[in-house]
Amino acid sequence: MDSLTGSQIIGQQLSDHGDEKYRATSAFSGEPMAPFFRNASEGEVDRAVCLARDASDFWATASPDVKSKFLRELAQRVNASREKLLNRASLETGYPEPRLTMELDRSLFQLGVFANLVEEGSWVDAIIDQRKANQAGPPQPDLRRMLRPVGPVGVFGASNFPFAISVIGNDVVSAWAAGCPVVVKGHPGHPGTCELLGRCVQDVIRSKNLPEGIFSLVQGTQNRVGEALVQHPSIRAIGFTGSLRGGKSLWALTQKRPEPIPFFAELGSLNPTLAFPAIFRRNTSDFTKNLLASLTIGNGQMCTRPGFVFYVKCRETEQWTQELLTAASLAPQQPLLNTSVASQFAEATEQYRVQLDARQIFPLQTKDEPKSEFDASPPSLHLYQVTAAEVLRCGAKWTEAFGPVCILVGCKDLEEMKAITNTLPGGLTLSLHADPAEQTLAAQWLSDWTAKFGRIVWNDFPTGVPIGNATQHGGPYPASFDGQGTSIGTRAIERFARPTCYQNFPETLLPPELQSDNPRHIWRQVDGRLTQDKLPH
């Protein structure tokens, strides 16, 4: 792979029409790094989307074999560039190599998962109601329904996952698997990593002689680049992972279009952890160790980080708090992703103090000292403590802080714990730590939790999100705009497909998945029964 160019990747072309230049910043030194990148021009965004539109019919009807081979070859191509990718991503994010290696391996695995999904083919949810003339009531026509790709998709990469939620990340791969060309808006925090990944995609598309519009990458620090993408009339859906503020701004633009489009956004979540009393009446060392690991992985820059721990105050919880503080002093530290994240982290933690009347218990506050414009010292884990009564008195103004921080909320009894958790906004996860004897109590609260959270965790922590068939990564607002879908796991493909029904169609005009002979041998629901059988003509 050649060295970085700072160019946009528009189909098979490298483009440099933008005027404003910028550079990535080292997470370790704060120094700008080569090369200069350009903010994509409106013309470059338009060209990328038009190429995607032109490739749409081909990719929508391409065989499962073509799509799966593309995904598998891309995994091989990215893996061959592993060393260069890891080196650049570490400089741009500050993540240590083991953390990045794990993320890259996960992303390569995800490509294989979706290749398998496409090959098997049943994800299209084919449903057939055969013609019924001899039944009570009017005759029923032949109805055949399946999921079809929506068309070109715009995807916004995230700051905290340079591989897994980026150019080859979950939104992009699930859109490709659904049959949608993709235009990626790279995150300005790691533009070099984005370009290196984009060149891998470009190489595979060229080597397999596929339409160039299946993929383009536009980059920039200016809001206008993303705004041009979401407002382009040929974009049919958006995938976004980022802040609530940024997501709301882009969502508003999609709804102001002459034809509003779906905006699938993963925004933010408090991820409360509820610790029932029995937890503290036994050895809490594993609970403490695993909580800290969940809080500090990626330096707390995870959308599933457990931001609040609720418990009933007693002598045992006082002892546990001291145990937690001792363990926190040994927690690993690393830089935050960039100065913007650091600034927002400082602002959010200050809001905890002001809006929730929370008291910082780790690290102990010291007199402010002058700092340089770039402070390369990693922020330590921040722990705050507050009572439920104080939070309720302050109006329960819940705010997410993106970084290594957790609020310990002490409740006078279980009734107060239930009262305060009922004020929580929608979220990605809720975790419950309890003894088997407390299952009856948990059952009484469960319906409240399922109404607000996408994934409910029993005696575990929420940071790990497996790429599975049952995975749910999404939840009611403000975790997502549409809590009915998931952005991780095989079901993520359904966001970029919509149902189409064919009534009384001749066999020759039906997609293979709906033809009576079932040439792709997929599972289908026929007259209410799952089967892979052929149907009589």
Where are each of the predicted segments found?
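N-terminal Rossmann-like NAD(P)+-binding subdomain of aldehyde/semialdehyde dehydrogenases
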Residues: 1-141
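NAD(P)-dependent aldehyde/semialdehyde dehydrogenase
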Residues: 5, 289, 311-428
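Short, well-ordered beta-strand elements within core beta-sheets of diverse protein domains
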Residues: 34-39, 55-61, 135-136, 154-155, ...
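Structural signal for hydrophobic packing residues in well-ordered secondary-structure cores
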Residues: 56, 60, 75-82, 86-89, ...
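Short loop-to-beta-strand entry elements in the cores of soluble alpha/beta enzymes
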Residues: 70, 178-193, 214, 259-277, ...
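Rossmann-like NAD(P) dinucleotide-binding subdomain of oxidoreductase/dehydrogenase enzymes
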Residues: 122-292, 310, 314-317, 535-536
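C-terminal core of ALDH-fold dehydrogenases
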Residues: 373-377, 414-510
